[in-house]
Each structure stands twice: as structure tokens, then as C-alpha cells.
Amino acid sequence: MPAATTHVEMAKEVYALSAYLQSHITDKQMFYLGSQGPDLLFFNRASILPGSTKKYGNLMHVAKVKEVIHYFEDYSKNDPLLRSYFLGYLCHYCLDSIAHPLIYGVAHALHTEGGPSEGEIHVTLESAIDLHILKKKGRNASSYNVYEDLRQDPKNVAKLAKMYRNMFHAIFDISLTQKHLERAIKDVAFFTKVLKPQQTKYKIFYAIENTCLKGSHAITGMMLQGEKNYCVLNTEHTAYT
């Protein structure tokens, strides 16, 4: 993927394209949340704690993608709120389809050259893209506030969780509780705020990673702080496999 900020900023640019499109997006907050696609499930319980919905987000990225899109399209057709979410969801896959091949290629190449795990490099690359996007908007890391665009009214959370619960049952034959999915949706705004750049917080998380996560720095890699020297923008047009 790219990460949360890049997906939301793309959604904002899509929204600005035409009045016709805006007439079909009646709730911008739901549209922006939709732009997170299945990544919505990655934030639950910080991704690494027991019971996280991360594995279901991974599943949605690799299995029955078309079926899920068709399910959400049909489910949301008479509900303007969920339709706004669905249109944002489409934006997610548009951006992923462009960015994923490059991110995976660069991550694999850097790992092969002796870098950390591909997963750690992947999220660090994504945060580098986020930082680049903010700079293009005349902003910097300290202005990071994507969590404000991802907050939801409790009624909206309940409605979206119900759609996901029904989808998992219908498409994957997986039973998830309404409560679990509502918590996962709320965790998106909560944990993207936890990732807000701050030097002391960065150092604390970095030390925790060294102590408890065997030196894997995937969490701090998601923060728009620290060294971001990976050439993910590929301005030299290097070929990756």
C-alpha cells in the first residue's frame, strides 16, 4: 500500500475532481476512511497484539478481492453513507495497484542487499512517501494529522462494522463479532494518532522494539520521523523485480 496519509490525500484530490462525484460522496469522513481499504483492519490492537484483525486485512488484499468489491458495491447501493465509504474503498485499490509493485520491488532489493525484513522496509518506504506527499502540500511531519480525517461517529462505526461482518460471513465464511469490528474501526484513528511524530515518543518506541521485538523497527518505521533515505520515489527509474 502507501500508508494512511497518502491514501487520504489521494482521496481528497479525487473528491475535488468534479461536482458530479461530490454529489455521490455525501460523507467525506467515510470517504476518507474508505480510502484505507482493507488497511482499516491493520490498526486493531496495534497489529502485533493477540486478537488483532490484521490477518483479515491481509486476507482481503490477496483473496477474493473482486468478490469483496462487488459485495460492498451491492450492499451500499441504497445507503449514501456506506456508498461514500465504498467510493473511497475504490480509491484505495487504484493507488495500491500503482504503488505496490514498486514498493515490493524496492523492499525486496534492499532486503537482499542486507537490509532489515521486507515488512519493516515496506512500512518505512510508505512513511517516506507520506512525508513526500506532505512536503508537496507545503507541509511537514509536524503537521501530520490524518487521524482527524479518519474519526467516525459511533453510529457510522456500527453501520460499517455490520457491513464488514456480513461480508466476511458471505465471502469468506468467517464469523467476526460486531464488537470486534467496531473496535477495529475505532482503532484506525486511535493508532494513527499514536504514530504522530514526536522525538521522545519515537525514542521510547525504538527502545521497546529493541527490547521486546528483537530489534524489528516496523512501528517506528511507520512514524514520519528518523532517517527516511530509501529511494522509493525511484526518480532514477531503476528496474526492480
Predicted regions and their residues:
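N-terminal leader/auxiliary helical segments
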Residues: 1-87, 93-241
